[in-house]
Each structure stands twice: as C-alpha cells, then as structure tokens.
C-alpha cells in the first residue's frame, strides 16, 4: 500500500520528503491548514479590492517595487512574472529533486502566510500526486530572492506552459497535463510570487543530499571496518573508555559502529611491542568519520526547520498585517550546505587514502594492486588514480559558495546567498565520495580473498563481504574483466537499499551516540 503523507505545514520530516520524492508516496492536506490558506487569501483579495499598495500584489518586483499596478493588471502581472523569471540554464534537475521541491513548497504554503488560493495549492499537489514533474534547469538561482528562476520553471506546467516529465517521457507542459487528466490554471494576484519566492529549490536539493549523506556515513564505517579486517587492525582505538573522555557524539557513535561491525572477527589484533599503533586512516576513524557525523546531524536539524518554514515575501500575518522582509534569503541554509559538502568531502578523502593502503604492497603486504601476477596484470592500479581524482575534485568543490555574493536587480538585491550552488555542490561531492567508498569496499573484499589465511569476519563485515560477492567475483586476471563494469556493479550493490538494510539487521549503526 502506498504511504500517505499528511501535510500541515509544521511536521514534515526528512524521511517523508524521501518517501514522496523517491517512492511515490501520496500526500493529503490538513483541514486546519486549508482554513489558514483560505483566511490568508481573503486578506489579499481585500488588498486588491481596496487598491492598497503592497509589494508583489499591486506593485512590480525587485527594483520595480515602486511601480504601481492597477487592479485589472494584477493577474497579468503574475503570469508575466513566471514567463520572464523562468530563465534557468543547464541540465535538468533529477526528478526526485523536483518532487522534493514541489512537496516542500506545498508544505510551506500550507502555513497560511502567503495569500495564495487553496485551489492553487491543490493544483500543485495534483501534479505531485499524479506524477507530473516539471522540467527545471539546475542553474540560475542566486539563493535570494529565494530560487526565483528554477521555481518559475516549476510553475510553468501549472499554466500549460514549459515542459514536464510524465511516465518517464519529457512532454510540453500542456501535453503532460492532458495525459495526466489535469486542468491548467490562471494565476490570481500575489500567486506567482507566492509560488516562486522562497528557498525551496536549494532546500529540496540539499535535503536529498543530507539524507544520502547519512547513509554514506554508515557505509564509510563499513568500508573502514573492512579495511581493518584486511590490515589486521588494532582494536584498542575503538574502546569506549577512550571516547567517553572526549564525548563528541559522532566520535562515540563511530567507535561503537566499528566495534559492532568487527564483533567476532578473527582478523583484528591488539597492540604489541612490535606494532604499537596503526596509521591515522585506521586508528582515527572515530575522530574523522565522527566529525562528519556531527556536521550532518547539524545540517539535518537545519533542513527540518526549513522544510516547515515560510520563506515567502511579503508575508501576511494572521491579523492581516503585510510584512516585507527577507525570509527568502538562503543564507541560513547556504552555510549548512557548504558545511555538508566539507563533511562529505572528508569522507571521500580518508576513504581514498585507505584505498591506497589496500593497493600498496608495501603497506598491505599483499600483491601489488591487489592482483595475482602483477606486471602482466595491473589490477586496481588505475582504480586508485580514479579515486584520487574524485577526492581532489571534491577539494575544489568544497570551497564555500556562501562566502560569495554578487549584486543584482539594480543593486536592490545587493547581497545574495548562493545557497543553491552550495546545495548542488554538496550533491556532487556526495556522488564522488559515494563512488570512492564503494571502491574501498570492493577493493577490501578483493584484498581479503588475497590474504594467505582466510579468518572469520566480523558480525557486520561478513554480510557486507557476502553481498559484494553475490554480484562481483574475485578478479584473478585482467583479461577476464573490464574494470569499469566491476566498479559500476560495486557501486550499484553498495548504494542499494538492500546492502545497508541487510547489514543493519546484523548490527546497529548510527550517526549519533
């Protein structure tokens, strides 16, 4: 049975965003929220009837805010806004990101501060529930005033304009509506602005990256534990006593995760006079992975505030006051999403260094590049190069977008957040780091099969190894494979919901203690 998400403007969770964006969960509107939307709309209708001067209702936009618009032109004003603000560039956003954007916008409008008609909110919901996904170019937003360009592309199909995906096919907006059995609408006063003035695109993209980042942090612990198995890692750096005296939550959680994953392993060891300490990439897994866990926990908290917030301008209070402010400004999310990118980049960085330890015969005491008869065979040689390339690209992408600004709109909008760029960068860093971590898991399984003694694996590392071996064979000779196909298969296994779910049935994994 399809999950039904109840939207009230106040209680949307990150997990519910994923359910709608990726799994087709249907949504319904809360009755009290509907009443709030209707009450807010009545105030806008009164403003138009009384010919009051209110930004975006009876005036132009941006630096044209001092240009008065007659009541008879207020409808055309809103359509003009959408037609001219839909000026995005680049490839389309993924459909799951667009569905997240639609959902978050609906939830924000349900708080009843935007003056939009209930029927217009219901129309956007109809598109979402029936699987009509607007074509939104990925570039063109400054993250203030909100995400004007991409959100305008979201609105176009509601008017029978633009383009949209329906049942996997890209169609004109009108054709998508026709095939889904949806009637187009005409916008009323304030509605175009209510639909496009907000941080919804950057939040939608960043929300998906945050959720996926949480999964990646668990996968990175699995990868690190498998590398520990290969290197006969010393387990004392993961003892609880060490971490309770520095009670950083992510660090404590990581140490516990590694203990759980390695429980029962016959490959790990203890410190001896001959071998006192392991290198940082093994010994300091709790401190390195844990810092990223704490960062992403902070970002998730910010995301769940933002997806239940009003980021429109102007807003209309319950008492009927109109306030022009700056809730559309993306800075409160731009900085967290920059932080997210840095946290995910570090996971890729340390994983790549562990890949190097696996393929380096001087460090692993295994055949060079994890292949029998190196020389005739190159094995994982260039795989490590590829991981290094992704890790280095991540370092460039980790430069914060939020420290940049560029004035726009005749200097009326003179300091912007670049939050959408921050979110997009974080999503790209995530993809790169996820490939590196999947490669570490694949390489560690290859290394385990090359070890002269095949000891029992840990409670969590054993199912990880078995899941990889169900889809990928041990690589004996270069002539038997095209390694990019093997890498793609490894990524598909590791990124599948089954991989993490199976391991979490065996051991508890968490990102906070």
Kindly label every feature range from the protein language model:
Residues 113-139:
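FAD-binding glycine-rich core of flavoenzymes that anchor FAD
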Residues 55-69, 73-77, 84-107, 137-159, ...:
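FAD-binding core of FAD-dependent oxidoreductases
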Residues 92, 115-117, 218, 302:
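Alpha/propeptide regions of enzymes that mature by internal proteolysis
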Residues 113, 142-144, 375:
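Conserved, non-catalytic sequence blocks in retroelement Pol enzymes and Pol-derived host proteins
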Residues 17, 81, 85, 97, ...:
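Short alpha-helical scaffolding segments that buttress acidic/His motifs in well-ordered protein cores
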Residues 2-25, 29-36, 40-48, 70, ...:
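C-terminal auxiliary extensions adjacent to catalytic cores
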Residues 37-43, 47-65:
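N-terminal low-complexity or amphipathic/hydrophobic leaders
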Residues 26-27, 86-89, 111:
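A glycine-/small-polar-enriched, mobile loop at the entrance of the PLP active site in fold-type I
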């Amino acid at each position: 049975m399809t999950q039904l998400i109840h939207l009230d403007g106040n209680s949307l969770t990150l997990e519910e965003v994923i359910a709608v964006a990726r799994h087709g969960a249907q949504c319904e509107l809360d009755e009290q929220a509907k009443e709030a939307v209707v009450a807010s709309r009545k105030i806008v209708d009164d403003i138009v009837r009384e010919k009051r001067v209110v930004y975006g209702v009876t005036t132009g936009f941006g630096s044209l805010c001092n240009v008065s618009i007659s009541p008879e032109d207020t409808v055309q004003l809103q359509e003009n806004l959408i037609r001219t603000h839909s000026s995005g560039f680049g490839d389309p956003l993924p459909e799951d990101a667009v569905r997240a954007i639609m959902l978050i916008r609906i939830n924000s409008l349900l708080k009843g501060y935007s003056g939009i008609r209930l029927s217009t909110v219901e129309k956007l919901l109809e598109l979402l529930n029936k699987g009509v996904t607007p074509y939104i170019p990925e570039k063109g937003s400054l993250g203030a005033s909100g995400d004007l360009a991409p959100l305008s592309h979201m609105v176009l199909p509601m008017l029978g304009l633009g383009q949209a995906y329906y049942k996997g096919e890209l169609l004109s907006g009108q054709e998508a509506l026709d095939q889904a059995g949806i009637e187009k609408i005409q916008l009323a006063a304030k509605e175009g602005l209510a639909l496009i003035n907000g941080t919804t695109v950057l939040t939608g993209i960043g929300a998906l990256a945050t959720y996926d980042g949480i999964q990646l942090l668990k996968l990175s612990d699995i990868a690190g534990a498998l590398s520990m198995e290969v290197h006969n890692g010393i387990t004392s750096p993961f003892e609880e006593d060490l971490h309770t005296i520095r009670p950083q939550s992510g660090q404590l959680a990581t140490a516990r995760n590694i203990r759980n994953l390695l429980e029962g392993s016959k490959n790990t060891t203890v410190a001896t006079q001959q071998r006192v300490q392991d290198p940082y990439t093994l010994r300091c897994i709790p401190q390195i992975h844990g810092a990223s866990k704490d960062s992403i926990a902070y970002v998730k908290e910010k995301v769940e505030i933002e997806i239940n917030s009003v980021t429109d301008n102007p807003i209309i209070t319950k008492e009927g006051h109109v306030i022009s402010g700056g809730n559309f400004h993306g800075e409160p999310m731009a900085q967290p999403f920059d932080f997210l990118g840095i946290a995910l980049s570090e996971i890729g960085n340390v994983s790549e260094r562990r890949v190097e330890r696996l393929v380096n015969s001087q460090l692993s005491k295994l055949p060079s590049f994890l292949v029998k008869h190196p020389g005739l065979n190159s094995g994982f040689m260039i795989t490590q190069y590829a991981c290094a390339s992704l890790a280095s690209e991540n370092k460039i992408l980790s430069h914060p977008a939020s420290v940049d600004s560029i004035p726009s709109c005749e200097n009326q909008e003179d300091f912007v957040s670049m939050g959408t760029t921050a979110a997009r960068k974080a999503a790209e860093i995530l993809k790169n780091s996820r490939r590196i971590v999947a490669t570490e898991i694949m390489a560690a399984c290859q290394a385990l099969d090359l070890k002269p003694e095949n000891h029992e694996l840990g409670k969590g590392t054993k199912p990880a190894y078995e899941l990889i071996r169900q889809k990928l064979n041990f690589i004996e000779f270069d002539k038997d494979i095209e390694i990019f196909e093997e890498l793609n298969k490894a990524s598909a296994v590791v990124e599948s919901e089954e991989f993490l779910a199976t391991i979490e049935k065996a051991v508890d994994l968490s990102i906070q203690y």
